Design a protein with these regions (language model features):
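Short, strongly hydrophobic alpha-helical membrane anchors
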Residues: 1-11, 140-142
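Membrane-helix boundary connector in multi-pass membrane proteins
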Residues: 95-113
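Short alpha-helical packing/oligomerization segments
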Residues: 66-96
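N-terminal signal-anchor/start-transfer transmembrane helix
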Residues: 15-36
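Juxtamembrane boundary at the C-terminal end of a transmembrane helix
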Residues: 126-142
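Physicochemical signature of membrane-embedded alpha-helices that form the seven-helix bundle of GPCRs
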Residues: 15-18, 22, 51-54, 58, ...
Length: 142
């Protein structure tokens, strides 16, 4: 018998809502991170721009909770994990792009790739977590 053969036994229903909360929290922290990067670029130039620890931590926690969700629902967990990893990778490259923009004295653009990936992740996690709201209508049609 494997340790995770039975999956997560306690709090299975809470993981979906935890994912939804983490995605929304991550998007809010991304907004604060972008404002902080703009302020750092104005005050100290390109060398003053540093990673926002809260964004990094929230993204890693989001990926880890997505992996936990994969032990409960393989298909949905795999999709959410791939999307969360996409957000993590895009955050890494968006930070580097902000530093390049600051070095070239260009205005800092919003992190479009990370925002786009976050909205796709938000749409899927909302579908998974809030499906009970549309289930009666869905069952009538399908």
């Amino acid at each position: 018998m494997q340790p995770l053969q039975l999956g997560l036994l306690d709090g299975q229903q809470l993981v979906e809502f935890l994912l939804l909360f983490l995605v929304v929290l991550n998007m809010g922290i991304r907004y604060l991170s972008h404002r902080r990067h703009q302020r750092q670029a104005e005050e100290g130039g390109p060398d003053a721009i540093t990673r926002f620890l809260a964004l990094e931590v929230s993204t890693v926690v989001l990926v880890l909770v997505a992996f936990v969700y994969m032990t409960i629902h393989y298909h949905g967990g795999m999709i959410i994990s791939i999307l969360a990893i996409t957000v993590l990778i895009s955050d890494f490259f968006e930070f580097e792009a902000r530093k390049v923009e600051a070095r070239n004295e260009l205005p800092l653009e919003s992190p479009r790739a990370a925002i786009g990936a976050s909205f796709v992740l938000l749409a899927y996690v909302s579908y998974v977590a809030l499906f009970f709201l549309v289930e009666p209508f869905w069952s009538a049609v399908v």
